[in-house]
A protein has these predicted regions:
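Non-catalytic interface/targeting segments
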Residues: 1-60, 64-65, 89-132
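Mid-chain, well-packed structural core segment of small domains
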Residues: 59-91
Length: 132
């Protein structure tokens, strides 16, 4: 089982920049299918000039995910996401979440690349403190 996040404004498409995203839809994906887990909404207001705090809130929202799909991400933010052991995947804006879920399910049903297999073998802690 793999937990993945999607930066979205409508719950249907990946259409948001990571640093501005206020909503992440979270799914569990396996070779057999996928299921929605929850929608996480960023509720803390962004303070002007506090890029670190803004990124911390978003990283915390997806901390239990192995992958976060997004429309855009800056270099510094990508490094911080990667350091949190989350793999950022940039996709064209308005890519359908359903197609990404099916593509990931298909990869998991075959022979996933080594970086993805490591995520399958390594449980992490969710924002609520429980394993993913």
């Amino acid at each position: 089982m793999l937990r993945v996040a999607f930066s979205t404004t409508d719950g249907v498409h990946v259409d948001e920049h990571f640093g501005r995203c206020l909503r992440f839809d979270i799914y569990d994906v396996s070779a057999d299918g996928h299921r929605p887990v929850r929608t996480r909404v960023i509720t803390t207001p962004d303070e002007p000039g506090d890029e670190s705090g803004r990124l911390d809130a978003r990283i915390d929202a997806v901390r239990d995910c192995a992958i976060v799909h997004l429309a855009a991400i800056g270099g510094g933010a990508a490094a911080r996401v990667t350091n949190a052991r989350i793999h950022p995947v940039k996709v064209p804006e308005t890519t359908a979440i359903a197609s990404l879920l099916e593509r990931l399910r298909s990869v998991l049903a075959g022979t996933p690349p080594p970086w993805l297999r490591r995520h399958l073998d390594t449980p992490t802690t969710s924002p609520a403190g429980s394993p993913r």
